[in-house]
Amino acid sequence: MAAPHPALRVHGALSRGVLAVTVLVSLAVLFAPGSDVPSAPPGVDKLVHLLLFLALALTGRWAGIRARPLALLLVAYAGLSEVVQAVSDLQRSGSVSDWLADVAGAGLGLLAWRRLERRRPAR
């Protein structure tokens, strides 16, 4: 197998820092009180969930987390976030469709990383 594209190599503190910021953004988005969540057209919520977990998957892989453990962590995090939203005083509701959007985003991110890994750098 060819070496991965140079842009996809783990970049130590930089990649871990970007992952940490992405996790912090996800915490802010997923656990903001309902009163702080802006209204949006139908479907935007699912797109936000998908893109958020896509970003978590990509930054997690860039930080060197292997695909299978990362996938399991993201599926669990997605489920936990929906349970917390459902049972907490955040004035939010848990949703299976949000969880599915999260899982789809994580899956797309992992697939995109895998595809990019297999590309050869331009010469």
What do these predicted regions represent?
Residues 1-99, 103, 107-123:
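Bulky hydrophobic segments
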